[in-house]
């Protein structure tokens, strides 16, 4: 496999977020692009990172499918060293069992990290159906989650047709409520087809919300006592999706 990113911007934003959830990342490359799908160790959250072929300047893989597994901490360490405007190449070296990461900026640098051995079992993405979809300013939902973390350890979402989303944090003595409706600055679009209620871990939501740097818009999909779907799109070439199991408060 040899793929070339036009710059390091997306990698520097996305890799640390993914590394905060999983220790090993399995990247599956096909003619449709590169995809990472993984559950966190507690099996509470799933992360999906999709990169279309259009995200790359050059895109070459061996055969119909190529799978590589790396330590996300190793990848994060290297990505932190990259400059945003540097062109970046990922190249597999099967003889040395390494992933080479080439940075092409003012200085040409070549890093390498081990390819990990293990079962090449692809994690299936669950088939989920939602009737409630809300598009929010990503920095606004991050602010809501950050503020709520001072109140409680879970965040409650209530969807009310046709266009209201209530987000609430309740502690022993403190409480915070946010009501979002169509027409507000933080709301890009809101489509509530059915009433829904669910509660989710703030610790996980805080990790997800760091993706506000990836995209200006966060897409939420909700259903009663059902996994939360939180999606961020980078220039329509990459997608970062989080699926979070509900809490039974």
Swiss-Prot record:
Chloroplast found in the keyword field: no
Sorted UniProt keywords: DNA replication, DNA-binding
InterPro entries, alphabetized: DNA_clamp_sf (IPR046938), Pr_cel_nuc_antig (IPR000730), Pr_cel_nuc_antig_C (IPR022649), Pr_cel_nuc_antig_N (IPR022648)
Pfam families: PCNA_C, PCNA_N
Highest taxon of the lineage: Archaea
Gene Ontology annotations of biological process type: leading strand elongation; regulation of DNA replication
Keyword DNA-binding attached: yes
Example of a GO MF term: DNA binding
Role played: Sliding clamp subunit that acts as a moving platform for DNA processing. Responsible for tethering the catalytic subunit of DNA polymerase and other proteins to DNA during high-speed replication.
Assembly behavior: Homotrimer. The subunits circularize to form a toroid; DNA passes through its center. Replication factor C (RFC) is required to load the toroid on the DNA.
Family: Belongs to the PCNA family.
Protein name as it appears in the record: DNA polymerase sliding clamp
Organism: Nanoarchaeum equitans (strain Kin4-M)
